[in-house]
Structure formats: structure tokens, C-alpha cells
Amino acid sequence: EPHMTMPRILALGILVIGGCTPVTDTNPPNIVYMLADDLGYGELGSYGQSLIRTPNLDRLAADGMRFTQHYSGSPVCAPSRGTLLTGLSTLRSQIRDNYEVGGYPDPEELGQMPLDSGTYTIGTMLQDAGYVTGAIGKWGLGGRESLGQPRFQGFDYFFGYLDQQLAHNFYPTHLWRNGSRVDLDNEYFSAHQRFEGTDPTDPEQYKRYQGNDYSLDVMADDALRFIEENRDHPFFLYLPFTIPHVALQVPDSSLAQYDGAFEEEPYLGDPTYLPHHRPLSAYAGMITRMDDHIGRILDHLDELGLAENTVVMFASDNGTTYTGGVDAEFFESTAGLRGLKGSLYEGGIRVPLIARWPGHIEAGTESDEVSAFWDMMPTFADIAGVEAPADIDGTSILPALLGEQRNDDRSLYWEYHGLWNGAQAVRVGQWKGVRLGVHEDPHAPIELYDLEADPFETSDIADRYPGVVEQIRAVMDSRTESDHKPWNFASTGEG
């Protein structure tokens, strides 16, 4: 280039000195991992969504790699996050379902079943690698009196909801910063109530379901501050956003972005969560507002000169929900995949994964590498240049990120206890096995689908491939017994 600028010359010099290895010992990359809550496979523009606007995530995909066969750890919140943080699938992980230590409701904020004290998490691993670790958002793996809290599980810093139940309300009275309560400018109201006004079409009668401090906004501001404060050394920032989990609540400015977009009927809070006079616009507005904040985070990385040396990832903890006024059919939220949140069919567990790392991940690429949440721990270890624990279920997807295909035929396993009277699923290569009603019958029949030929799981071909079914049954039967009896099937534990 005839007019090469001094910064460009310097950058080239640094590139030559640094060599072409993905990771240098002197300057390990920052890692920002963003996790949506109940966002379906088809709810981003880059995954085919046409009604909900996600320009910043679409830009992230255009600048990086989009995965088409990535799986969450579970079809519901807590166990999915547990697999992400520990590198263990629900074949043998501690947390295999949502479990409310404090019951419903939970005024003491005892939260969900906690991770054991001393669990080796992604946070612990990256702390050991010299990273400052932060988590901002929804935790769900230990309440305020437990050793499962982030500050005891490898995170130097936490701000957000410890208890998933409180995260049902986007206008909470308070959040938690490490071990301290942080009050917000919101009056208390339950996140589960029916419409009690006189006119369900009157927007004013829904104001009671709003407050002043929208938790997403407060947490996004905190994320910008964390990045700024830790700009001079390697950091890992885990951002488990609460969007678009119900209740349907969003500030008026985001609702207004969808004025006139949809013909919609009010949702009156039946059967659960909160009423909303414009439920389609509220849902779309929530996702777009999250996308706005992601844009702010990406811009902040640019402004601080950190974007080049920061791996940014975005995923979702499970598929779209089936309740609270959400219309997954209207938005084609799963892009045709069968099932929703709580299901082990593809719509419940196949999720978006977008990854950007300038200079390493080729822009505008796509990978059909089969991967899952428990692969993140060894992937982050590779990125940070450290060893992952040997005894985990994950495999690093760094080769896929760098454009090398792996796609081995390892098996991926899920189990879920909250619906279907107990369910298990296994993916091996092109094959997917699903077994329902396992609490009742540990030898329940296994459905078999060929995901290459039948991605929407419409045709059970178990009778045609008995050998594959037996291979899948062996994986299902190899699950370890959980210490929590309700999370066992009669065949492998005390159910």
C-alpha cells in the first residue's frame, strides 16, 4: 500500500514478531462469553429470523463463525449452565435439572441446587491461568447462603441474580454484587400474576408490571465498566443475560421499535408469568434490546483497542419457551426444529453459537462441527494456552474455530427429569436417539432419527437400525448415579 500508516506498519511488525501461533504466552486473549436465556435456534437474523431485528449479533456472525450443530447442556437453565462451567455433560454432572432449594416462592433467596464447594469450573481454570474472571447476569447454581455462589466458584467478580426465580422479573428490587445486596429503584411485585385491570387493551393498565431500573440495562452498564477496569490484563467475562426468558417485560422505548409490526392480542398472564398488552412486540423488543447492549459491548472493545485480542462468543442455554405469552410458532423460533425448552428433541437443545476472533477465525464462515456446552472448558483452555482438566467430557473446538474440521463420532448425552416422565437423548454422528418415560420404564423404547436426512425428527427409524439403537442404549445406560435421588432412573439408581 503506497500510503501505509505508521500504526499499520507497527501492527505488521508486531505480527511478524509475534509469529503466527494462535496464542502467545505474553498476551493471552480476553474471552467474552455471552449467553442468552431461552433464545431459540431461529431467533437471530444470522440464523434466518425475519421478524426480530438483531443487527449487532448479525454483525458478529459476519465478522466471525456461525455454528449450525451446536448444543446446549440441557433443555433448561441450571443444568445447562452447570455443564458449561464444569465441562461435564449430564451423564455425570452435579446439576441435572432445576431444583429449588427454597421452594416456590423463595423469599430467602436460597436459590437452586448449588455446585459443590471446590468444584473446578471454567472460572477456576482461567483464574489459575492468570485471568481476572467476572460473571454478570443470571447465575442459578447456588443461592446467597450457599458455597455455589460465583465468588466461591472461580469468579473474582459477580453482579446480577443469584436466584433464577428472581430473574423472572426484569424489574427486581435488588441484585447481588459478590456477597452484597445492591438495591434498585423498583417496587416489589410478583412476576406471576393474572391481568386484573378493567380494559386489557389499555396500555396504562399494564404499567404496574414495570419499574424504573431494567435489570438488563444495569447489568450491561456493569459489563462495560468491568471491561474498562480490566483492560490492561487478560480477563474472562461470562455474561449470562436474562433475555428473552419470560416474564414479558421491556422498556417502552424498545416496545416502540415494533409499533405497527404485528397484529397481536393481549396476553393476560394465563397460565403464568406476567400479562402484556403487546406480547409479540414485547418479545421481539426484548431480544433487540439485548442486541443493542451487545452492540455497546462490541463498540467498547473497539474503543479500548481490545477487539483484536478478544474472543467473543454468543450462545443460548436452551430452546424457546412454551409459556408466558411467547409465540414460538409465530416467530418460527426454532427454524423448524422439533420441540421447545424442556424437550430433548432438537428444538430444545440445538442453539446458536457465534464466535469472533479477528485474525484467527475467518470472517463470514460457518461450521457444521457437532459441539456442545461441555466443549467450552477445553476450548477456553486452548485459547488461554493452559491444560484443561483430563477428566471432563468436552473436546476443544479450537480446531473448528481455526477452520479445521474434526467431526469425530463421539457421543453427546443429555438427560432431563422435569418433563416427559424422565428423558434421555444421545447424538452419535448423524444419529440421534431419544427415550421418554424413563422414570416409569427404564427400558422404554428408544426413538431413532437420522439428523442428516431428517433434521426435524419426523421419522422414527429405530426398527431399521437395531445396531445403532443398541449403541445409543449403551451410552444411555452408562450414566452415573446422581447424589440427588429424583435425578435417577430406576435402571441406574434409586429413582
Question: Which residues are covered by each model-predicted region?
Answer:
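Sec-dependent signal peptide recognition
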Residues: 5-12
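Formylglycine-dependent sulfatase
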Residues: 20-447, 451-491
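Short, Lys/Arg-enriched N-terminal segments with co-localized hydrophobic residues
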Residues: 1-3
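Conserved N-terminal phosphate-binding loop of PLP-dependent enzymes in the Aspartate aminotransferase
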Residues: 495
